[in-house]
C-alpha cells in the first residue's frame, strides 16, 4: 500500500509522541517519591480538566470490555456484589490490551456495582476519577494503568484468536452453498479486510485520544458516528451470543438425540432442551463482573480451533470417511448465502485497535495483520475443501454434525466445540451489558439488582431468539452480510477518508470507494438472501 509523505508523518508524529510520553514516564519513575505526590495530583487534575470527549462519551466501557473479550488479563474472580480487578494484566497470549495513550483515569468496568459501605469514602481507588486528596497510590495507579509490551508473536496469537472462531465450522457449508468457485470470495474478503484493518491504524494514529473503534467513528462523523459504530458492534456481539446458543443446541442434540422434556403441556425436543440448559448453565457466568478467569480459559480458542481442524483431517484421511464428493463448481442460486458466511470469518476489526495499541512495536502491526489473516485464511480454506470433499451436498451448517459419532476423533471435535462457547458466551455478551449499564442513572448505577437484571434479560433474550430462529448457518450468513460487512468493509474506508481527508492520495480514495462499493453490494445481496431463506424455513 502506497502512502504519501503526509500520511507517513502520522506515524512519525505518533511514534515521537510515544517516545516523549515514555521519557516523561521514566522521569516519573526516577523521581517518583512520596514527596512528589502533590505534583502527580496536580498533573492528574490538569489532565481531567481537559478530558477528551472520546473518553467521556458513551460507551465509556468499550475499551476495557473489549480488552477482556480479546485478550487475557490477570485472574481475579468476583461476582457483581464483590469484585475488583488487578490492574497488573498478565496474559497467556498477551499483556493487557491497553492503549499507550490511555489516560490515567479509566472508566471502571471491573469495579463492584455495590460499593463496600465500610470502606472509607476518602480511600483512593485506582479507578477513581477525582481523588479526594493526593496520595502515593495515585502514582501506583498511573503505572498500573498502562501496558504496551505485547510482542509480535503474542499479537499474532491474539489476532488469530479473534478471527478464527465458530465461523470455521461453517466454511464447508459455505462451499456447498456457493460451489468451489465461491472460495474466491473467501480469499478476496481476506485481502480486502486486511487492507481495511490497516486503514484503522491510520485512523488511530491521527490523534492520541482516538483509542477504539467507536473513537474512530467519533473522530470521523462526530457523536452520531460514535453511537452508530457502537450500536453496530454491540449488535454483532449480541448476535454472536445467539449463535453460541444455537451451536450448543445443535451439537449436544447430535450426541444425545433422544433427549426431551415435557413440562405442563410444553414439549422440548433435544435442540430446544439443550439450548435452554446451556442458557441456564452460562447465566451465572454472565453475572460475573470480572471475567479474567474465563478469559484465560477462552484463550484456548486458538488451540480449540486447531484441534477441531486436526480432528476433521484425521477423520477424512486416517479413519474410514475419506474423500467421496467432487462437489459443484458454482451454485449461483445460493451463492449470496456463502457471501455472508465468508464475510463472518473475518469479523475482528472491533478488536484490532486494542491489539495495535498493546504492541511494544506498533510498526509491526502490518506484519501482525498479515500473519493473522494468512493463518486464518489457510485454516478456513483447508477446512472448507476437506469438509465439502468429505460430505458433499449433505454438508451441514457445522461440519461437526457430519462427523461419524463412533469415532474417537469425532467425539473430541464435538466436545471441544461444545465446551468452548461456555467460556466465550459471557465474554461476548458482557460488553453489551456494560454499555447498557452505563445508561442507568447514577443514583441506581451502584445497585447490583439492575446489573443482574440487565444481564439476565440479555441472556434470556438470546435464548428466545435462538429458539425462534434455530438456523445456525443462515443466522451466521445474516450476521456476516448485514453487520460484518459494515464493520469490516464499509466503515473503515469511510472513517479513513473522513479523518485524513486532504492527506489521502487519489489512489487511496479510489481503493476505498471500491471497497465500500463491494461491501455495500455484498451486504444488500447477502442480507436479502439470508432473510429470504430464514423466512422460507420458518414457513415450512
From Swiss-Prot:
It is a multi-pass membrane protein. The chain crosses the membrane at residues 155-175, 180-200, 227-247, 273-293, 297-317, 332-352, 367-387, 412-432, 452-474, 478-500, 511-531. Keywords: Amino-acid transport, Membrane, Transmembrane, Transmembrane helix, Transport. GO terms for cellular component: membrane; organelle membrane. Pfam families: Aa_trans. It is found in: Membrane. GO terms for biological process: amino acid transmembrane transport. Residues 1-55 are annotated as: Disordered. InterPro entries: AA_transpt_TM. One of its GO terms (molecular function) is amino acid transmembrane transporter activity. Residues 1-11 have a biased composition (Polar residues). It comes from the Eukaryota. Belongs to the amino acid/polyamine transporter 2 family. Amino acid/auxin permease (AAAP) (TC 2.A.18.5) subfamily. This is Amino acid transporter AVT1B. It comes from Arabidopsis thaliana (Mouse-ear cress).
Amino acid at each position: 500500500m502506497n502512502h504519501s509523505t503526509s500520511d507517513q508523518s502520522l506515524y512519525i508524529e505518533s511514534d515521537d509522541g510515544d517516545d516523549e510520553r515514555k521519557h516523561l514516564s521514566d522521569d516519573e519513575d526516577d523521581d517518583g517519591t512520596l514527596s512528589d505526590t502533590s505534583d502527580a495530583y496536580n498533573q492528574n487534575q490538569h489532565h481531567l480538566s481537559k478530558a477528551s470527549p472520546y473518553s467521556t462519551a458513551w460507551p465509556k466501557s468499550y475499551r476495557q470490555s473489549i480488552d477482556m473479550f480479546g485478550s487475557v488479563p490477570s485472574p481475579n474472580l468476583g461476582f457483581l456484589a464483590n469484585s475488583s480487578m488487578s490492574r497488573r494484566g498478565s496474559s497467556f497470549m498477551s499483556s493487557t490490551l491497553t492503549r499507550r495513550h490511555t489516560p490515567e483515569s479509566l472508566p471502571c468496568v471491573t469495579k463492584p456495582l455495590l460499593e463496600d459501605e465500610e470502606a472509607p469514602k476518602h480511600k483512593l481507588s485506582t479507578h477513581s476519577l477525582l481523588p479526594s486528596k493526593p496520595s502515593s497510590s495515585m502514582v501506583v495507579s498511573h503505572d498500573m494503568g498502562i501496558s504496551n509490551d505485547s510482542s509480535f508473536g503474542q499479537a499474532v496469537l491474539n489476532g488469530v484468536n479473534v478471527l478464527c472462531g465458530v465461523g470455521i465450522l461453517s466454511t464447508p457449508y459455505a462451499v456447498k452453498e456457493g460451489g468451489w468457485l465461491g472460495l474466491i470470495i473467501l480469499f478476496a474478503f481476506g485481502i480486502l479486510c486486511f487492507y481495511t484493518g490497516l486503514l484503522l491504524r491510520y485512523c488511530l494514529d491521527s490523534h492520541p485520544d482516538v483509542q477504539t473503534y467507536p473513537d474512530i467513528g467519533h473522530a470521523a462523523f462526530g457523536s452520531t458516528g460514535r453511537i452508530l459504530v457502537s450500536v453496530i458492534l454491540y449488535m454483532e456481539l449480541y448476535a454472536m451470543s445467539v449463535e453460541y446458543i444455537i451451536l450448543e443446541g445443535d451439537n449436544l442434540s447430535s450426541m444425545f438425540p433422544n433427549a426431551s422434556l415435557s413440562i405442563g403441556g410444553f414439549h422440548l425436543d433435544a435442540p430446544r432442551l439443550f439450548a435452554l440448559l446451556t442458557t441456564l448453565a452460562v447465566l451465572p457466568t454472565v453475572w460475573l463482573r470480572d471475567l479474567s478467569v474465563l478469559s484465560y480459559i477462552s484463550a484456548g480458542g486458538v488451540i480449540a480451533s486447531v484441534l477441531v481442524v486436526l480432528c476433521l483431517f484425521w477423520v477424512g484421511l486416517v479413519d474410514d470417511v475419506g474423500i467421496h464428493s467432487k462437489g459443484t463448481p458454482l451454485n449461483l442460486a445460493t451463492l449470496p448465502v456463502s457471501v455472508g458466511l465468508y464475510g463472518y470469518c473475518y469479523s475482528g476489526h472491533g478488536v484490532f485497535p486494542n491489539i495495535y495499541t498493546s504492541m511494544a512495536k506498533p510498526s509491526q502491526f502490518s506484519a501482525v495483520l498479515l500473519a493473522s489473516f494468512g493463518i486464518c485464511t489457510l485454516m478456513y480454506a483447508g477446512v472448507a475443501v476437506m469438509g465439502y470433499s468429505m460430505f458433499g451436498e449433505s454438508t451441514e451448517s457445522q461440519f461437526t454434525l457430519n462427523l461419524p459419532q463412533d469415532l474417537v476423533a469425532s467425539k473430541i471435535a464435538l466436545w471441544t466445540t461444545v465446551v468452548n462457547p461456555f467460556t466465550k458466551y459471557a465474554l461476548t455478551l458482557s460488553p453489551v451489558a456494560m454499555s447498557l449499564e452505563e445508561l442507568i442513572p447514577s443514583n441506581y448505577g451502584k445497585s447490583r439488582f439492575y446489573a443482574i437484571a440487565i444481564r439476565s434479560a440479555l441472556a434470556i433474550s438470546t435464548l428466545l431468539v435462538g429458539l425462534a430462529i434455530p438456523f445456525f448457518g443462515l443466522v451466521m450468513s445474516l450476521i456476516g452480510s448485514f453487520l460484518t460487512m459494515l464493520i469490516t468493509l464499509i466503515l473503515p474506508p469511510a472513517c479513513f477518508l473522513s479523518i485524513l481527508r486532504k492527506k489521502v492520495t487519489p489512489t487511496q480514495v479510489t481503493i476505498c470507494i471500491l471497497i465500500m462499493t463491494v461491501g455495500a453490494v455484498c451486504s444488500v445481496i447477502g442480507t436479502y438472501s439470508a432473510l429470504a431463506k430464514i423466512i422460507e424455513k420458518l414457513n415450512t
